[in-house]
Amino acid sequence: MNHSDALYKRIYQKLLTEIEEGMYKDGQRLPTEKELSQKYYVSRITAQKAMRALADEGKIVRVIGKGSYIAD
């Protein structure tokens, strides 16, 4: 596992925990990839990988040009 893989997994786990603890409500918009990259001091690609993993699991819905939202 390289450094960027570890970083994306850390962001993924942090967001997953926040989702499961109810920090975000169903349908609520999540921070953008740019906002996440600035918050966690990572590249936008790393933030994108974390968001893609959440989408692949059905935790969030990504809408091109609109953002990412908590799945209902």
Model-derived segments and spans:
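Basic, amphipathic "hinge/linker" alpha-helix immediately C-terminal to the N-terminal HTH DNA-binding motif
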Residues: 66-72
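Extreme N-terminal segment that seeds HTH/winged-HTH DNA-binding domains in transcriptional regulators
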Residues: 1-44, 52-61, 66
